[in-house]
């Protein structure tokens, strides 16, 4: 599970972090602190953007 601060660090970093959503590698585009969600997309499908709870993201 990612906390808000770590998710923001990952989103701002130029270095790709190993983060998954439902076991799928994803890229974090934006973090919404108020709602504790992140806008993400799967690395293999950039068109599939979605907002998901930070609690469902895993850093490996």
UniProtKB/Swiss-Prot annotation:
Induction: Expressed only in the forespore compartment of sporulating cells.
GO cellular component term of the entry, any: endospore-forming forespore
GO-annotated biological processes: asexual sporulation; sporulation resulting in formation of a cellular spore
Compartment(s): Spore core
KW Hydrolase (keyword) present: no
Keywords annotated in UniProt: Sporulation
Entries under Pfam families matching the protein: SspH
Major localization listed first in the record, in broad terms: other
UniProt-listed InterPro entries: SASP_SspH
Entry's family note: Belongs to the SspH family.
Record's protein name: Small, acid-soluble spore protein H
Organism: Halalkalibacterium halodurans (strain ATCC BAA-125 / DSM 18197 / FERM 7344 / JCM 9153 / C-125)
